[in-house]
Curated annotation (Swiss-Prot):
It is an enzyme of class 2 (transferase). This is NAD kinase. Its cofactor is a divalent metal cation. One of its GO terms (molecular function) is NAD+ kinase activity. The keyword Cytoplasm applies. It comes from the Bacteria. HAMAP family: NAD_kinase. It catalyses: NAD(+) + ATP = ADP + NADP(+) + H(+). It comes from Burkholderia thailandensis (strain ATCC 700388 / DSM 13276 / CCUG 48851 / CIP 106301 / E264).
Amino acid sequence: MKIGHQFHTVALVGRSNTPGIAEPLASLAACIAKRGFEVVFEADTAQALGSTGYPALTPAEIGARADVAVVLGGDGTMLGIGRQLAPYKTPLIGINHGRLGFITDIPASDMQEVVPMMLAGSYEREERTLLEARIVRNNEPIYHALAFNDVVVNRSGFSGMAELRVSVDGRFMYNQRSDGLIVATPTGSTAYALSSQGPILHPQLQGIVLVPIAPHALSNRPIVLPDDSKIAIQIIGGRDVNVNFDMQSFTALELNDTIEVRRSKHTVPFLHPVGYSYYATLRKKLHWNEHPSNEEDDE
């Protein structure tokens, strides 16, 4: 068993628009408070649930006051609060109340048993990297954003291919005609990048992966770069091109706009139950190691 720091103040964050989430959140809050921990709620979560009987704090207030945030929802909920709490180094515990759950790894059915043990110091800790991006137009930055999973440049559904000029560390890599380009962290390598035939990067691997989306030339392949790389993507052709960050914020781009992407100085601490295995998560979520059907055996 790995014993870490015991926490005192615990923030609860939920996917507030999800039906049926109020009861498990209230139950978890009572379970944690009963064991002597101070409980606070993220403000939007508290507002959606109505009166919780606990203090309601903004993400900035959680960062300043809470020792740890427990997130009940899907991966999207974890991504959103992770970006907001990244400057404060607030550790996150993820409880899966969504569908896939690559980064919310505790089943909701186990939370009342597992979470109190973790809050008491029995957990495994890892740091996850983020990307920071800015859009430059006419030599002036017009937009900044953090991304936990990925920065995605893509065309709209009814426009033609985007034409992109990609440089790394000031050196020209290629011009690409495609539906877009994904710049992903190791965490994001199991998201959109994976569905576009990108490689899986272990979360502790120091890398950034570039994955073309439906490229015109079959020779355009994914590439893994060192995570200190500085990536520049210039729009040199196409129309209705957009950029999104974790699929949660979107910005329209113009011809000659440049998206500059690099590793953020911030990392997000993830806490896992003792015995956590990333490979077990992959095996379960991607259905690895499943046996052939009996029908195949009978042939």
